[in-house]
Design a protein with these regions (language model features):
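Short beta-rich binding modules
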Residues: 1-172
Length: 172
Protein backbone atom coordinates (compact mmCIF):
# COMPACT_ATOMS: atom_id res chain seq x y z
CA UNK A 1 0.00 0.00 0.00
CA UNK A 2 2.86 2.41 0.79
CA UNK A 3 4.20 2.15 -2.77
CA UNK A 4 0.81 3.31 -4.06
CA UNK A 5 1.28 6.57 -2.16
CA UNK A 6 4.66 7.65 -3.59
CA UNK A 7 4.32 11.27 -4.82
CA UNK A 8 7.96 11.77 -5.83
CA UNK A 9 7.02 11.59 -9.51
CA UNK A 10 4.16 14.08 -9.21
CA UNK A 11 4.42 17.48 -10.85
CA UNK A 12 5.38 20.41 -8.64
CA UNK A 13 2.84 23.12 -7.92
CA UNK A 14 4.96 25.93 -9.37
CA UNK A 15 2.46 26.82 -12.10
CA UNK A 16 -0.65 25.43 -10.43
CA UNK A 17 -1.75 28.80 -9.11
CA UNK A 18 -0.55 31.15 -11.84
CA UNK A 19 -3.26 33.50 -13.03
CA UNK A 20 -4.47 33.41 -16.62
CA UNK A 21 -3.08 36.62 -18.16
CA UNK A 22 -5.50 39.57 -18.31
CA UNK A 23 -7.28 40.08 -21.66
CA UNK A 24 -6.84 36.43 -22.67
CA UNK A 25 -9.81 35.21 -24.73
CA UNK A 26 -11.16 31.79 -23.77
CA UNK A 27 -14.16 29.63 -24.56
CA UNK A 28 -15.96 28.88 -21.30
CA UNK A 29 -19.00 26.98 -20.08
CA UNK A 30 -20.99 28.86 -17.44
CA UNK A 31 -22.63 27.36 -14.37
CA UNK A 32 -24.73 29.33 -11.89
CA UNK A 33 -24.25 28.37 -8.27
CA UNK A 34 -27.74 29.00 -6.82
CA UNK A 35 -27.81 31.19 -3.73
CA UNK A 36 -31.47 30.75 -2.81
CA UNK A 37 -32.52 34.38 -3.38
CA UNK A 38 -34.66 36.04 -6.02
CA UNK A 39 -36.90 34.35 -8.58
CA UNK A 40 -36.38 30.58 -8.53
CA UNK A 41 -33.44 30.92 -6.10
CA UNK A 42 -30.72 31.55 -8.71
CA UNK A 43 -29.49 34.79 -7.10
CA UNK A 44 -27.22 35.20 -4.09
CA UNK A 45 -27.86 37.84 -1.44
CA UNK A 46 -24.83 39.91 -0.45
CA UNK A 47 -23.85 39.47 3.18
CA UNK A 48 -23.05 43.18 3.58
CA UNK A 49 -25.76 44.98 1.55
CA UNK A 50 -29.13 44.46 -0.14
CA UNK A 51 -27.30 43.70 -3.43
CA UNK A 52 -28.15 40.54 -5.37
CA UNK A 53 -25.84 38.78 -7.81
CA UNK A 54 -25.37 35.62 -9.83
CA UNK A 55 -22.60 33.53 -8.32
CA UNK A 56 -21.04 31.91 -11.39
CA UNK A 57 -18.35 29.42 -12.23
CA UNK A 58 -16.95 29.32 -15.76
CA UNK A 59 -14.82 26.37 -16.87
CA UNK A 60 -12.33 26.99 -19.69
CA UNK A 61 -13.22 24.48 -22.40
CA UNK A 62 -9.99 24.20 -24.42
CA UNK A 63 -6.52 25.53 -25.02
CA UNK A 64 -3.61 25.94 -22.60
CA UNK A 65 -5.93 26.87 -19.72
CA UNK A 66 -8.45 24.05 -20.27
CA UNK A 67 -10.33 22.90 -17.17
CA UNK A 68 -9.40 26.02 -15.18
CA UNK A 69 -12.30 27.43 -13.18
CA UNK A 70 -13.09 31.12 -13.01
CA UNK A 71 -15.47 32.44 -10.37
CA UNK A 72 -17.30 35.67 -11.18
CA UNK A 73 -20.15 37.54 -9.52
CA UNK A 74 -22.55 39.09 -12.02
CA UNK A 75 -24.53 41.93 -10.48
CA UNK A 76 -28.30 41.78 -10.67
CA UNK A 77 -29.40 44.48 -8.24
CA UNK A 78 -27.10 46.91 -6.48
CA UNK A 79 -27.25 48.19 -2.96
CA UNK A 80 -28.68 51.50 -4.21
CA UNK A 81 -31.46 49.88 -6.26
CA UNK A 82 -34.81 51.43 -5.54
CA UNK A 83 -33.15 54.53 -4.10
CA UNK A 84 -31.88 57.71 -5.72
CA UNK A 85 -29.50 57.35 -8.67
CA UNK A 86 -28.74 54.61 -11.11
CA UNK A 87 -28.19 50.99 -10.22
CA UNK A 88 -24.68 50.82 -11.73
CA UNK A 89 -23.96 47.36 -10.30
CA UNK A 90 -27.18 45.91 -11.71
CA UNK A 91 -26.76 47.68 -15.06
CA UNK A 92 -23.23 46.29 -15.49
CA UNK A 93 -24.54 42.84 -14.66
CA UNK A 94 -27.39 43.06 -17.17
CA UNK A 95 -24.88 44.19 -19.81
CA UNK A 96 -22.74 41.13 -19.00
CA UNK A 97 -25.77 38.82 -19.27
CA UNK A 98 -26.67 40.37 -22.63
CA UNK A 99 -23.08 39.80 -23.77
CA UNK A 100 -23.17 36.17 -22.63
CA UNK A 101 -26.42 35.56 -24.52
CA UNK A 102 -25.07 37.24 -27.67
CA UNK A 103 -21.82 35.29 -27.51
CA UNK A 104 -23.45 31.92 -26.80
CA UNK A 105 -26.08 32.39 -29.49
CA UNK A 106 -23.85 33.97 -32.14
CA UNK A 107 -25.63 37.33 -32.22
CA UNK A 108 -24.00 40.64 -33.13
CA UNK A 109 -24.53 43.49 -30.63
CA UNK A 110 -25.86 45.78 -33.37
CA UNK A 111 -28.38 43.22 -34.72
CA UNK A 112 -31.91 44.38 -33.90
CA UNK A 113 -33.77 41.77 -35.97
CA UNK A 114 -36.60 39.84 -34.32
CA UNK A 115 -34.41 36.72 -34.20
CA UNK A 116 -31.60 38.61 -32.44
CA UNK A 117 -33.99 40.25 -30.01
CA UNK A 118 -35.42 36.81 -29.21
CA UNK A 119 -31.91 35.42 -28.66
CA UNK A 120 -31.35 38.04 -25.94
CA UNK A 121 -34.41 36.91 -23.98
CA UNK A 122 -34.62 34.19 -21.34
CA UNK A 123 -37.50 32.90 -19.24
CA UNK A 124 -35.32 32.05 -16.25
CA UNK A 125 -31.84 32.94 -15.03
CA UNK A 126 -31.26 29.18 -14.94
CA UNK A 127 -31.10 29.22 -18.76
CA UNK A 128 -27.65 30.82 -18.44
CA UNK A 129 -26.25 27.63 -16.89
CA UNK A 130 -24.60 25.47 -19.51
CA UNK A 131 -24.09 28.25 -22.06
CA UNK A 132 -20.73 28.28 -23.83
CA UNK A 133 -19.35 31.68 -24.81
CA UNK A 134 -16.17 33.65 -25.45
CA UNK A 135 -14.96 35.37 -22.31
CA UNK A 136 -12.27 38.00 -21.81
CA UNK A 137 -10.25 37.26 -18.68
CA UNK A 138 -9.59 39.94 -16.11
CA UNK A 139 -7.76 40.02 -12.80
CA UNK A 140 -9.46 41.35 -9.66
CA UNK A 141 -7.42 42.28 -6.63
CA UNK A 142 -8.57 42.82 -3.06
CA UNK A 143 -8.32 46.58 -2.55
CA UNK A 144 -7.77 46.04 1.19
CA UNK A 145 -4.72 43.81 0.58
CA UNK A 146 -2.08 45.67 -1.47
CA UNK A 147 0.08 42.55 -1.87
CA UNK A 148 -2.81 40.46 -3.20
CA UNK A 149 -1.90 38.69 -6.46
CA UNK A 150 -5.58 38.69 -7.40
CA UNK A 151 -7.91 36.18 -8.95
CA UNK A 152 -9.21 35.64 -12.45
CA UNK A 153 -12.70 36.79 -13.39
CA UNK A 154 -14.67 37.04 -16.62
CA UNK A 155 -14.48 40.75 -17.48
CA UNK A 156 -16.59 40.61 -20.65
CA UNK A 157 -18.36 38.25 -23.02
CA UNK A 158 -17.47 38.77 -26.68
CA UNK A 159 -20.10 38.40 -29.37
CA UNK A 160 -20.06 37.39 -33.01
CA UNK A 161 -18.99 40.90 -34.06
CA UNK A 162 -15.56 40.53 -32.39
CA UNK A 163 -12.67 39.72 -34.75
CA UNK A 164 -11.51 36.69 -32.69
CA UNK A 165 -14.96 35.26 -31.94
CA UNK A 166 -15.05 32.53 -34.61
CA UNK A 167 -11.51 31.36 -33.85
CA UNK A 168 -12.10 31.09 -30.10
CA UNK A 169 -15.51 29.42 -30.46
CA UNK A 170 -13.97 26.89 -32.84
CA UNK A 171 -16.01 27.85 -35.89
CA UNK A 172 -12.92 28.44 -38.01
Amino acid sequence: MASDMDFNGADTQDAAFDLIPANTLVKVCLTIRPGGAGPEGWLTQSKTSPALYLNTEAVVMEGPFARRRIYTRIGFRGKAAGGPGDDTYGNRGRAMIRGILESARGVRADDQSNAARGARMIRSLGELSGLEFVGRIGIERDKDKPDDTGRNVIKAALGADHAEYARVMGSV
